[in-house]
Amino acid sequence: MPSPTFRLYNTLTHETEPVEPIEEEHLRFYSCGPTVYMYAHIGNFRSFLTADLIRRTAEAIGWDVTNVSNITDVGHLTQDDLVDPGGEDKMQRALEREGERFANIYDLARHYTEAFLEDWGALNLREPEVRPRATEHVTDQLEAVIELVEKEHAYTTDQGVYFSVESVEDYGHLSGNTEAQQLQATERDVVEDPDKRDPRDFALWKHDPQHLMHWHSPWGWGYPGWHIECSVMGMQYLGDRFDLHTGGEDLIFPHHECEIAQNQSLAGHQVVNYWVHTRFLQVEGEKMSKSKGNFYTVRDLIAPGPDDDHVPDSVREQGGVDPLALRYALMQGQYRKPFNFTLDTLHTAARHVRRYQDAAERVDAALAADADGPDELGGRLRPIYDRTLEAMCDDLNTPAATAAALDGVKAIEQTDRLNGATARSARNWLDRTNALLGVVEPEHEADQRTDAGSENGLAPAHLSDSIDTLLEDREAARADGEYARADAIRDTLEALGIEVMDTPDGTEWERREQVG
């Protein structure tokens, strides 16, 4: 049968729409990734799972996919949820909280990035084509900020550089927030810059020479704002027109609203066509909270430690649940509806995943035996897969998709004798279902594309340009006798895994190790 039409809910238009890629049958999208200051919780991963399912569904209908998913390792302020120009960087606050565990802020970022990637793999999420890190694109971000100032979409104060919300039309369109609602949000700001022109204006660059992660800029030492990071990384790899952008509903305002303002000011036109957001997750009917004891990271549930007393006994006593069971449980609510995560849901998911695994073991044993006989399952399993794919194309209706797919497991279970032909049909169905839903068996991809275009430990081209720019700044500082600034630039490069060598013929560098 022909592939069904892939439809998703577009936050920008408030409509469920057919997804029509700019390039025919090639979906190009950006996914907001984690801020690596703590272990990611199951609500975070529900959003990342949505992006993974978009990818799998697009591939199932024959499309090519290019996905960019970032790592935020600088610039996400504690008050960025409120468009606060002040507040404290989440990375810096994390180091204050856990300073004894880490030598410096880069070690902290490396630790939580590695943990995030481990959790990502455990939940069977496919790797994006590019996973850029904000700290590797600071030069690019500076260039964007300079351009916004030149175009009079931004202005400077003693505290930094701000985007002028008044300079763009339709700010608030994505979220539906009126100007009054935007102003109400800013009333909760912790730190305010008296030189801001409009309370709604947000930071593009923060002037702070004392910040633990800082770079030289035309406005002095400081660091980039969170919103400009994603705008720059998205357009760096996907161009100034791409199909889709994903994230959690908490990012609609202000983060994605700010991204749209920046993107359109830089490009001069709409950059992203579809905005897809995952709704919040509750645990046992309540907001997830450490104070309530219902705050779960992924590793709390798949590999709890002996001191993780907040983890339910039914999970801790068995050493954690199968990661695929957690993935399956998170799929029991459609992404754009609030989801109540319960232990009952988790344990039911574990039983269903075990049935898939038992069926796969039985099928593989039958394949090895390869007994003669007619195919008794192909005709039953093909329409089951079609129904599963139709549900996924219907705005990622994962509850309907997993229910349909379970009928395929039942069909295998109810087949008394699996001959070779029947087993081949069953294995084909299992493989196709796993490619679509990712709940049958772990996938082990050979090309783990965890860094932005890196291959064999070599720095990607865009990073090489940034490094050369930093080295030029360092040489200028040394020539001017500003040795402290030159040393700070060298420290920044070394923390990024770049070894700087001063030779009689000039300064050279090489990539020593990957960050994170």
UniProtKB/Swiss-Prot annotation:
Catalytic reaction equation(s): tRNA(Cys) + L-cysteine + ATP = L-cysteinyl-tRNA(Cys) + AMP + diphosphate
Keyword Cell membrane appears in the UniProt entry = no
Cofactor list: Zn(2+)
Identify the keywords attached in UniProt to this record, alphabetized. Answer: Aminoacyl-tRNA synthetase, ATP-binding, Cytoplasm, Ligase, Metal-binding, Nucleotide-binding, Protein biosynthesis, Zinc
Determine the domain of life of the protein's source. Bacteria
User: GO CC annotations?
Assistant: cytosol
Task: Note the InterPro entries from the entry.
Answer: Cys-tRNA-ligase (IPR015803), Cys-tRNA-synt_Ia_DALR (IPR015273), Cys-tRNA/MSH_ligase (IPR024909), CysS_C (IPR056411), Rossmann-like_a/b/a_fold (IPR014729), tRNA-synt_1_cat_dom (IPR032678), tRNAsynth_Ia_anticodon-bd (IPR009080)
Give the family from UniProt. Answer: Belongs to the class-I aminoacyl-tRNA synthetase family.
Q: State the name under which the record lists this protein.
A: Cysteine--tRNA ligase
Gene encoding this chain? cysS
